[in-house]
Structure formats: C-alpha cells, structure tokens
C-alpha cells in the first residue's frame, strides 16, 4: 500500500460546527489568544484558561464528524494512512481513522503542570484543585503558544515517507505545522484543499483545490481510489 499522509487543520472541523482557530480580528471565540492559549495566560489567570477549555470540551459532545472526516477514514481501505492534525478535537477518531497524530494536543486529555508525560484522558470539566499523581495541578494537554511541539519530529518523519500528501482545512499560517509539507519527497504528489488555496504562494508541485473540505473530498475520492491501485 502507498503511504498517504493527511495534514488537517481547523477548516475541516469548521464544517462540523467547530469555530476556526482565529478570526480576522485576532480573537479566538472572543478571547485574546495569549490570554487563554499561552503559559503567560495560564500563570496570569488559570481559571479563565480552564473555563475556556471546559467550554470547548463540552462543545465536542454537540458536534459530529462530517463527510470529509469520513472520506479520510475510508481511504484506509486503499492506503497506509497517517493523519497529522492541528486540531484538538476527536472528530477524526470518531470518523473511524486509526492513525492520528495530534500535533497541538487534545481536548480530551489533561496533563500534569510539571510533567508533560503524565497524561490522563478527561471528558468532564477540569477545575483548580484537580491534581495529577505528582500532586501538581492538572492543565489542558494542549501545546500553547511559546511551547515546543513535542511530536514535530515524528510528524516530519511521516511526511518524508509519504507518496501522497493531502493538506486540508489549514491556512498554512501557523508554524511549525505550516512548513511540514516542505519535508515531502520531491516526487510526492501534494494536494492543498482550502477555500483560499489559490491565494497561497506554494511550489508548482502543489495542486491547489479552491473548495471546502467536504466538497473537495467528494470530488477527489474517485481519483484517489484509482491512484491507489
């Protein structure tokens, strides 16, 4: 089977009702990003950070995978598929995909404030006073601005092995994820799916599809299945 790597971003989950990462005004669901998604914000007002992520975690139980998520899961019948997602939701998992690398963490897990390897699955609200086994406060298992991306090397390794790379639902503006495609083999076929794909200044070997995730995957599926054989 050929190796297919998917790099997914907020655009694919937006079609399930999850708001995209940031609006044009630099706010994230009405919040200053640095207030709710940085070590600075956590130190300044941990309760505000917890409230923000508790709200987002609750929202997960009100949304469902869309046809684009399901199409990517369907491709496992034809390819060795690895999904590298910038999203912190679980919609790829619920759609049926089996190999998913969450580059920026997950809403449904929390970790020790002191030890990033002490991680717990968590579906309820997280509160001040909820402690890890090392007695430190639990925090969202999210890679915040200013923090290293621990799974970056693994993601780069997957991209290097890809015969085919599909970039879907990302503006390619959040680094280091935005530069992942540059690690693809020179002979790899690359598709970039985004409503504003044509505005991106990308190399000629990247085929831009100026559509939403759902529409583009519906159109592309027959070709992808044919190419797998």
From Swiss-Prot:
CDD domains linked to this entry: SIRT5_Af1_CobB
Binding site for NAD(+): 9-28, 86-89, 169-171
Gene3D superfamilies xref list: SIR2/SIRT2 'Small Domain, TPP-binding domain
Catalyzed chemical reaction(s): N(6)-acetyl-L-lysyl-[protein] + NAD(+) + H2O = 2''-O-acetyl-ADP-D-ribose + nicotinamide + L-lysyl-[protein]; N(6)-succinyl-L-lysyl-[protein] + NAD(+) + H2O = 2''-O-succinyl-ADP-D-ribose + nicotinamide + L-lysyl-[protein]
One Pfam family in the UniProt entry: SIR2
Catalytic residues, chain numbering: 104
Keywords: Cytoplasm, NAD, Transferase
Entry GO MF terms: histone deacetylase activity, NAD-dependent; NAD+ binding; protein-malonyllysine demalonylase activity; protein-succinyllysine desuccinylase activity
Sequence ranges assigned to domain Deacetylase sirtuin-type in this UniProt record: 1-227
Enzyme Commission number: 2.3.1.286
Main location: cytoplasm
Enzyme class: transferase
Positions with a binding annotation for substrate: 53, 56
Cellular component GO terms, alphabetical: cytoplasm
Subcellular location per the Swiss-Prot or TrEMBL entry: Cytoplasm
Protein role: NAD-dependent lysine deacetylase and desuccinylase that specifically removes acetyl and succinyl groups on target proteins. Modulates the activities of several proteins which are inactive in their acylated form.
Domain comment quoted from the record: 2 residues (Tyr-53 and Arg-56) present in a large hydrophobic pocket are probably involved in substrate specificity. They are important for desuccinylation activity, but dispensable for deacetylation activity.
UniProt similarity note: Belongs to the sirtuin family. Class III subfamily.
Protein name: NAD-dependent protein deacylase
Organism for this UniProt entry: Helicobacter pylori (strain ATCC 700392 / 26695) (Campylobacter pylori)
Gene field: cobB
């Amino acid at each position: 089977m050929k190796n297919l790597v998917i790099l997914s971003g907020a655009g694919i989950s937006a079609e399930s009702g999850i708001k995209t990462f940031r609006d044009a005004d630099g706010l994230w669901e009405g919040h200053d990003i640095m207030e709710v998604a940085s070590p600075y914000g956590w130190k300044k007002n941990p309760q505000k950070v917890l409230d923000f992520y508790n709200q987002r975690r609750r929202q997960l139980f009100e949304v469902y995978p869309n046809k684009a998520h399901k199409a990517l899961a369907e491709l496992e019948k034809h390819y060795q598929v690895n999904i590298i997602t910038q999203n912190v939701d679980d919609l790829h998992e619920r759609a049926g995909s089996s190999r998913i690398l969450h580059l920026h963490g997950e809403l449904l897990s929390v970790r020790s404030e002191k030890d990033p390897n002490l991680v717990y699955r968590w579906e309820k609200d997280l509160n001040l006073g909820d402690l890890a086994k090392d007695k430190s406060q639990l925090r969202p298992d999210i890679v915040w601005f200013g923090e290293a991306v621990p799974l970056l090397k693994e993601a780069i390794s997957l991209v290097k092995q890809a015969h085919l790379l599909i970039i879907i639902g990302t503006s390619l503006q959040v680094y280091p994820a935005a530069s992942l495609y540059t690690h693809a083999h020179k002979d790899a076929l690359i598709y970039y799916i985004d409503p504003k794909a044509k505005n991106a200044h990308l190399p000629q070997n990247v085929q831009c599809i100026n559509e939403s995730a759902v529409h583009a995957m519906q159109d592309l599926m027959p070709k992808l299945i044919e190419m797998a054989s």
